[in-house]
Amino acid sequence: MTQLSPYDQVISRKRKWTPLAVQKGEVVEGSEDALKRALGLRHLELPVREFLQQGLDRELPNTPGLREALLSNQKDEENHDLALNYVIKAHGAEEKYEDEARHILRAWLDAPEHPILKAAILERSVFFVILPFF
């Protein structure tokens, strides 16, 4: 029996999902700023997708499933962007947090690190943390 690579294992566990529009929910008093600040970070979703594309355009190790995992993650970024924009449509945005997120985005775009490293850091430090809230 052939053992799956770590990338193939991850791909085999993924479930297809489709973002759906949401209605405005109740927000706990005092959490509005945190909600709006987290939603502002949605501006990083499609750049993460682009970082993955830049990584795909470079030479990569020939590990089975690596390329497929990166392509699958790109689709996830599109879905995350759509889902977060549904929440924005329901709850609205606040310009000061939108500006803050764009400032953070500029810093990430200017960072010299490998694009896949940038994508991995953003996924683990930002999106793995905030997406469960939405």
Predicted segments with their positions:
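Non-heme di-metal
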Residues: M1-F134
